[in-house]
Regions:
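Generic structural signal for residues in well-ordered beta-strands
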Residues: 24, 77-78, 263
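Internal alpha-helical scaffold of NAD(P)-dependent oxidoreductase catalytic cores
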Residues: 45-130
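Short, conserved loop/helix-junction motifs that constitute active-site signature segments
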Residues: 17-19, 44-47
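Short, well-ordered coil/turn elements that cap or connect secondary structure elements
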Residues: 19-21, 72, 219, 258
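A conserved regulatory-domain signal marking ACT and ACT-like small-molecule sensing domains
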Residues: 181-271
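Interdomain hinge/lid region at the active-site interface
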Residues: 111-179, 196-199
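Short, ordered loop/turn segments at secondary-structure junctions
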Residues: 29-30, 58, 82-83, 229-230, ...
Length: 271
């Protein structure tokens, strides 16, 4: 049972050395982290994550065993042919890694005073730039045929944008097109995107503040879907942004303000 990130090249290599495709099961768990090693392992890594399997021509007993393992680890089985798999992961995994690394590369040599101005937008877009070079050199090289047309289109789109930077209408259309693309990403548990309220809360940068905030959430009986934390350089405060339903956001805002917390107005967006 194979769990590598690229399927076609591995299948070809296996056939080249004379191993029957009937006893080789190509799979790929779509779960991982930007850091590696046993110390980075998580017991819940595969839970509710897609696990791709190409069972074409594979022995039924081996397929059954693979399905049982995937189910045991809590993942969601997705049947997909190896060629389609490589094209799909080139778009949703490999191209994002390349673009994130390219963006982070632009920061090299930048003045520290500039970098001190960065917020969650920059950190979010370069997070996976911290990935392991030795792993990604193999992934990108192995799937280069699927990556090249995507990267070429990305470069072409960037060059087109470069020629339109003084055209406000074109820039607006460019940003709107990105909004449409982002909206295509499935929401929680693979379902439809939901509208969340993002509630910013200023907290003191001292021990126990985050735990105290979560205690207040429990008291208010609200469900926190996600959160982000920002630290301002040179400041003794941090900004916690909680993602909640509109109803829970209103409830928590009232509750926290009554308790003396510094709560800003919530903003809504679809996730």
């Amino acid at each position: 049972m194979d769990i590598s990130s690229v399927k076609v090249k591995v299948k070809v290599d296996v056939q080249t050395v004379g191993i029957s495709s009937a006893i080789f099961l190509p799979t790929h768990p779509m779960a991982g982290r930007e850091i590696g090693g046993a110390e980075s392992a998580r017991a819940d890594l595969f839970i509710a994550r897609p696990w791709i399997m190409d069972s074409t021509g594979v022995n039924a007993d081996l397929v059954r065993a693979g399905r049982e393992l995937i189910e045991l680890l809590g993942a969601h089985l997705v049947e997909m042919e190896s060629g389609e798999h490589d094209q799909a992961v080139a778009l949703v995994s490999h191209l994002p890694q390349i673009i994130s690394s390219l963006l982070a590369q632009q920061l090299n040599g930048s003045p520290t005073s500039w970098l001190n101005l960065s917020g969650s937008g920059l950190r979010d877009t370069v997070r996976i730039a911290g990935s392991h070079p030795e792993l990604w050199k193999e992934i990108i090289a192995a799937n280069n045929k699927a990556i090249k047309p995507l990267l070429s289109k990305f470069i072409s789109d960037a060059q087109n944008l470069l020629s339109l930077l003084d055209d406000e209408k074109a820039i607006s259309e460019f940003i709107a097109s990105g909004n449409e693309g982002k909206a295509q990403i499935p929401g929680k548990h693979g379902g439809k995107n939901r509208e969340y309220s993002y509630l910013p809360i200023v907290i003191d940068d001292k021990p126990g503040q985050l735990a105290a905030l979560f205690d207040e959430c429990a008291i208010a009986k609200v469900n926190v879907e996600d959160l982000s934390i920002e630290h301002s350089p040179g400041q003794l405060t941090g900004l916690i942004t909680l993602a909640l339903s509109k109803e829970d956001s209103d409830t928590l805002t009232t509750h926290l303000r009554e308790k003396g917390w510094n709560v800003h107005a919530a903003r809504s967006t679809v996730q």
